[in-house]
Amino acid sequence: MDKRTVRRIVATALAVILAEQVFFLICGFGLPVQFGDTFMGELKSKYERLKETSGKRIVLVGGSGVAFDCDSALMDDFFSSYEIVNFGMYAGLGTKAVMDLSENYIHEGDIVILSPEQGEQTFSDYFNGEYMWQAADGAFGMLRDLKSENFEAMLGNFPRFALEKLNYVMKGQKPQTDSIYQKKSFNTYGDIELDTCRENILPNGYDVNQKVRFTEDVVQPEFMDYMNDWAKRLEKKGAVVWYRYCPVNKLSVEDMDDLAAYDVFLRQKLDFPVIGNPENSLMEAEWFFDTNFHLNQPGKEVNTVQLIRDMKAMLGDDRAVTVELPEKPHRTWGEVPAETRIWTAKDSETYQGEETIVIPENVTQIEDYAFSNCAGLKQIVLEQKDPSKCIVGQHLLDGTGAEILVPQMSVDSYKRNYFWSVYAGRIGEVTAHAEK
């Protein structure tokens, strides 16, 4: 092959690569906003509120546990000289993301309360580029506040984000939103409004896939350092930084006897104060809604009153917090009724060696690792049309390469669902052939 031919091939290849990159850039940045009404679409509003509010603020930082569990209007009644900013978003995005996005806009006089959900992912440097692109759609300026170590994840997820936007534009419809997990569920403070969420809807009163441990190995050592360094930078600006335990469903805790030792460990390792009694974070199941960290409306009120008391204690204010607390909601679970049930690994054993497993519509929860021993499994077919009626955890597909097939017209709902979205890349539409 002569040099001229080689140069032509190289030039053609470079032109194709350049054209591809330009195509992605046009789709990602040039097409209209598509994810603005989704759950992640709320982050830009929280970001703008944090940037624009002046004076002293109480800034609540964490995952969706913060968004669900705090009543900012009630806090406003007791701390009227402060603006309240709820900067809790989504554990699936990563705690680091909200810490990084908030850092440049914390200023002197602020009280910052870091309250991640208790778990290995939230206590690590985990960062999800896919969710970050969805959150930034239409507000790409906030990406400048991300740290350089996350640029690779952002670049790697950009083509998928761009193609998703193009797909929605071509179909003439934006991503479907379901139940409470959408932007319009948030109020101006950044809290999720829970007026219709007053009871525990979990099959056993807690999420069996979300066991909670209070042990030292839950916290990534590097992330402990990251929290301390972050707090120091905020304190240098004149802010006060506290850590507070996120509310946890008591039924989900593996060993409550571990809490005391864990609290000692946390207070020794963190260079900023831990406020409140950790025992108060363990709340009875009746106060929760749909996860082991999401409170229902009555639970939210109870937790917020306790948060106010914790803060007043730190500020040296010994005046009583007199608020009429709501009654505990009635218990909505017991023995799992015959018409609804949880799918376990034992259920999957009967399909050993088969390529397809069909999950009936009456299954309300699928346990983690339920398909890990199903050699040869290719398809998991769900008959449930509404993804919010079947809860799954983070390890649903561990040990299997199977794809998830859902009813027609439900694909987008599953891909955008709070619980199922982590498996979006492996969710497709069921066909008549697959159903057989």
Each model region followed by its residue ranges:
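Membrane-embedded segments
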Residues: 61, 65-146
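Structural signature of tandem-repeat unit edges
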Residues: 334-343, 351-365, 374-390, 400-410, ...
